[in-house]
Amino acid sequence: MPSPSSRAPRPRPLAEVWLATRGWRPFPFQREVWRALAQGRSGLLHATTGAGKTYAVWLGALQAFGTAGKVRGKDEGGTSADLADAGEAAAGSPADGKRRKAPPPEPLTVLWLTPMRALAADTLKALRTPLDELAATQPTLARWTSGARTGDTGSAERGAQSRRLPTVLVTTPESLSLLLARADARELLSTVRLVVADEWHELLGNKRGVQVQLALARLAGWNPRVCVWGMSATLGNLPEARDALLAPLGAEVAEEGVLVQGQVDKRLVVDTLLPDHPERFSWAGHLGLRMLPAVVRELESTSTTLVFVNVRSQAELWYKAILDARPDWAGELAIHHGSLDRGVREWVEAGLKEGRLRAVVCTSSLDLGVDFLPVERVLQIGSAKGIARLLQRAGRSGHAPGRPSRITLVPTHSLELVEAAAARAAVQAGEVEMRASPRRPVDVLVQHLVTVALGGGFEPEALYAEVRRTVAYRDLPRAVWQWCLDFVHRGGPSLAAYPDYQRVAPDEEGVWRMPSARLARRHRSNIGTIVSDASMAVQVLHGARLGTMEESFLSRLSPGDCFVFAGQVLEMVKIEDMTAYVRRAARGRPTVPRWAGSRMPLSTVLADFVVQQLAQAAAGRYGSPELRCVRPLLDVQQRWSALPTPGTLLAETLRTREGWHLFLYPFAGRHAHIGLASLFAWRAAQGEAGTFSIAVNDYGLELLSATERDWAALLPELLRVHAAPVPERGSDAKPLRLPAGEALAIRNTANAARAEAEDSSGASVIETGSAPQDEARHALLHEVLASLNATEMARRRFREIARVAGLIFQSHPGERRSARQLQASSQLFFEVFRKYDAGNMLLRQADEEVLSQELDVAQLLAALRRIQAQDLVVQPLARPSPFAFPLMVERFREKLTNEDLADRIARMLAQLDTAADAGSAAAASPPAQDVVPPDPPARPQRRRAAAKKATGKEGGGEDGAAPAARTAMQQAAEAVRRTLDFSLTSSEDAGNGAAGGGRSRRRERKPSRPLPRL
């Protein structure tokens, strides 16, 4: 027996060998992942962007699953093709004079899920590099093949994959569901040993993540040995994220799942581009292109920069502005967003990788996954609104271990300087937003039932147990399950007479299948949970295709109208066959396109840090450059009112010619503020009928009453957590009147609480919890629904739900249906279900999504409870404070044209700046013309004279203004107008009803002709 000293050295692991060829050494977290994979364990890997997560999982997979080398038999998950190829390989022999056939490729072993199909090509390239190099020395890996399958995959490659899938397949959740819908799905997918969910944080919190959970449960049923690994860089609730990923594998596997956190020394720099002259009275987006010269200077000092913006319209504006400022950068400056043609996007991505581009103005289309090593720096125009998004974008620079990442925030209004300081503090504290899986989305479950019926069929009891393994459907009641089965079987009670909705039926053996080939093709064409507005192709007349734009915008343009798209000024020629034909315009003022969508709300984590920064300013501590820069605004706010702190709730009251104002600053985010504002207005109307206008932003809300209100006395009643009983129809409750074209459509309707109707199991579809203390939330939901036009909001939500559930047939590949057609179809179903099928689960889901997503009821309730623990500070104002001013501008936007709004803002700015310049004496000076004090003075004539003098409206001219003063005011209005055109699109895209200024501008329509019951 040889002595220990004479034994041969243990061979180095395969992964270390490959890293050594690159001159790299593995990080400890990579070794930990390799050990877990070798043991067949699943888990979640969390590490900073660019730390080497891909190599950690991929090299571990090659070590664990790439050395078996034998063909699997049927009992081991081998396919018929594997066995046939193995037989052919063994049939020939040298004695027969025939050359032995090469061994067959390994079957599908690794599924790599990416959230964006645009990332598939880059991911595949990253996986192929070590695979090809290791295959030269590892015979078993030589039989591994690789490929991608997404919506962009060509027909030839799809055909080849239909005959044999590659060993490692990079795909999307939608394409995985398509594979599950194949009749031979079990034979194809039962060989999978590893599923990787890349960028798990992007999937976890939405329906695509639920789609992944259901698919994993299906795969685990076919192969209990399958491993699942998730990768993420920006998650705040790691144990919950791991459980959501691993729960579909079974309780035992989930309990043994590992959580690996990569600790890599990587420097992150978060700084801010400070404005030269920050304004004391700011509103969303008002800085606009004033920061353009500073941005251009920053771009001049770096070789390659990504300029991130939050919306596509803002990307078009900034790209054009930078190119106008530096026309010599043509060819070095590019634009990238999801509406551009795929060829354009790929050209931009290639230019970034090769270092040919100086800068790219982009949206979230470049947030994820793609490695652009030449990128040195990232600029973020406007607030990122969340820490996770900030970290994700920062990681696009220095995307490699050991290289620093730098992101520079460019504020679009003065208060975003406070957000910038708060964001840096949150990053230093290691705080990141949490993400949770949606609860029981019925539309996704209905779609999955049809998919599984296509993929070999299912037995209801077995599938029910399988579905309940997922976190999303862990508490799925039996009654809801039976409703879903009935819905896919016969369409429910209201669609029972229509064959198109009788999609799934049990066969003689009790297996539920989809017998109609036509309905099968229709379902496969519309699998997925991504719902977007109908779009049109934009194509140069007799030229190239530029991309797509939403039909709602293009349909409003007439021939000859100009608009900006793909960084060019285009002129509309005609619209034909859902294609907008354009030509490049030589002149004309272009319209900036708008894409439908909601404004991104400020995350609760970032909002808490903003309040902490304000508390430091209130204590006189201006430690950061951002706070020192914005100090003039904060000083005026503190002198005229107060600064919010974590322990106080600031309320401001003001009397103007418009009425009686209440400003509140809960810092709960835009969505929660919409619900709070409507709730407070409804409560105020219960004691006395009134007319209210509402405005909201991320910091606070405004209520404006046309009749006198003692807001200070009303506040305790408005801010209570426990709800009062909802008045029944016909009661003596005071109505809440709304002016035409004003505010949120708030209605005192007792039947709005119908969303709380209970299903046959006795459980509310809208989660209220089971503990007695959650009764407050249940009652609050009734009150919130009673205060809102919940029906209209639910109708808009229902369109998306109906599409996912398969009620609306969007199109066959290559076809397009207009938004009007889709909207008409969804509205018809909505009205029919409300009339004939009030217990329809899809209707209830629409109500629940309105509460949980559009109004963020959970955050609303949390805000009310936090308010109860705070000291209420009520500050009467003589004029709008710096915090109140942007709320007033939000409200003005909803009823004034750009011209009128610019004049109004310029006049108010002149008055407020004059008062602010007066220093401490301003509080005692007469208020400006737009403001009437709570107690009118005894000598109004002197008051009006002082107001005229302050605004320059005394002497000469039609309006009484002196020529010089009038010219100055006109110049100020023009300056405001230039930034206003930008700010109206820079804040966020329009289109989500209540998002822009806090009210819904959509009008109720008469119900369409109901579908007859046969």
Name each region found by the language model.
Residues 576-593:
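Short, solvent-exposed secondary-structure boundary/capping segments
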Residues 447-458, 534-542, 916-922:
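Short amphipathic alpha-helical interface segments
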Residues 464-535, 549-550, 593-594, 601-748, ...:
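Extended, highly charged accessory segments
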Residues 7-8, 20, 25-31, 38-51, ...:
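Helicase motor core with emphasis on the C-terminal RecA-like subdomain
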Residues 70-105, 729, 733-759, 763:
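Intrinsically disordered, low-complexity domain-flanking/linker segments in eukaryotic proteins
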Residues 530-532, 557, 564:
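Short, well-ordered loop/turn sites that connect or cap secondary structure elements
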Residues 543-561:
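A conserved acidic, glycine/proline-rich C-terminal tail/linker
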Residues 568-575:
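Short beta-strand-centered aromatic/proline hotspots
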